[in-house]
Amino acid sequence: VIELVWAYIVVNKDRIAALEWKGIIHTDKALTRDFWYYTTPVLCASLVWGIAFVLYSVILGHMGSDAVAANSIASIVKSMVQCVIRGVSAGAGIIIGNLLGAGKLDKARKYGGRITRLSIAIGIITGLLLIVVAPVVSRAAPMSDTAKGYLGFMLIVLGLNLMGQSVNTTVLDGIFCAGGDAKFDMKGNIGAMWCFAVPLGFIAAFVFNAPVWLVYIIISLDELVKLPAVYIHYKKYIWVRNITR
């Protein structure tokens, strides 16, 4: 609520995108059509991603209370580190979208490369940071020794996974969406999560009763599995286009 009120004040004060009841009630049909055309794949991608993560929790829940406890703390630590990645992704979308909307396609393409390289560096830094603090966090966590062992391993896996996630999040959610190329994010989530991580995770946990460490690696590989496809699609430069009217 506080964030909503603050956003309303800033928007109307600086006239960035003034909110008017007339514009809310009487919408432009062409704009509404474009809005749903470009945002529906984003919503679907988020839905696919969210449900998959719920199923990850179901898989780990089958592995026992120690695995659940370790995953709970690992997820909190991961969310804290991800703030940096999400910030870069949001900034990338604004910068690239502004350039594309202004018709500066060559400059947008150049900046896209720079931002992608920046995301690689941030992924390496945040990933290594998470790996370094893994022993400290696992020792300080109020849980059983078995759960602490799981937690330390999970944080290391998450650190390695963040290196790929940084690039994927920046490119998919930032650069691609700025150019209206949001369908690939949905396809990537379906392929990496629903055709790989989720089914293999369920088979490993429920059919073969695999150890926690192996199951966790399987359900954490979705970002790395998706990375080559993201790079190939990025180099096609389909996202370098002006979608404004």
Predicted feature descriptions by range:
Residues 1-7, 86-89, 158-178, 184-196, ...:
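Short runs within selected transmembrane alpha-helices of multi-pass transporters and secretion channels
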Residues 1-40, 96-161, 204-245:
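Short alpha-helical transmembrane segments in multi-pass integral membrane proteins
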Residues 2-6, 24-55, 59, 80-84, ...:
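Hydrophobic faces of transmembrane alpha-helices in multi-pass small-molecule transporters and flippases
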Residues 5, 51, 55, 79, ...:
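Transmembrane alpha-helix boundary/anchor motif
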Residues 42, 46, 54, 58, ...:
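Transmembrane alpha-helix boundary and packing residues in multipass membrane permease domains
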Residues 47-80, 98-99, 136-145, 207:
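Helix-terminus/linker motif at the lipid-water interface of multi-pass membrane proteins
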Residues 66-67, 182-183, 211-212:
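Membrane-helix interface segments
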Residues 70-134, 166-185:
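Small-residue-rich hydrophobic transmembrane alpha-helices
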